[in-house]
């Protein structure tokens, strides 16, 4: 991003999707026994993460896990002092797409 005095931001493609195109998290679903967290976006895409990827979420009770707040930029768990960003989720998706073997 541009930090010059003119306050105009230069967004990278991920920032553009979030701040200009309005991409956001709509809902989060958990299945602790299966170690799955599903993140539903407003463009109808679903992101999947392992709960165990984050130590605080992995050790959370069901009540703590379900006590979260969705903001414009991510998810916050006040009981756990844990924050996961939409930007981080999208970056992980890009890495997964690049590293996955092509299917023909």
Where are these regions (language model features)?
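Motif-centric detector for short Cys/His coordination patterns
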Residues: 1-104
């Amino acid at each position: 991003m541009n930090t010059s005095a003119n306050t105009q931001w230069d967004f990278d493609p991920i920032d553009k999707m979030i701040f200009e195109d309005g991409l956001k998290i709509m809902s989060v679903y958990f299945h602790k026994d299966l170690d799955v967290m599903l993140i539903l976006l407003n463009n109808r895409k679903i992101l999947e993460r392992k709960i165990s990827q984050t130590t605080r979420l992995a050790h959370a009770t069901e009540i703590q896990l379900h006590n979260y707040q969705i903001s414009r930029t991510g998810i916050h768990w006040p009981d756990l002092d844990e924050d996961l960003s939409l930007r981080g989720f999208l970056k992980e998706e890009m890495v997964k797409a690049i590293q996955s073997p092509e299917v023909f």
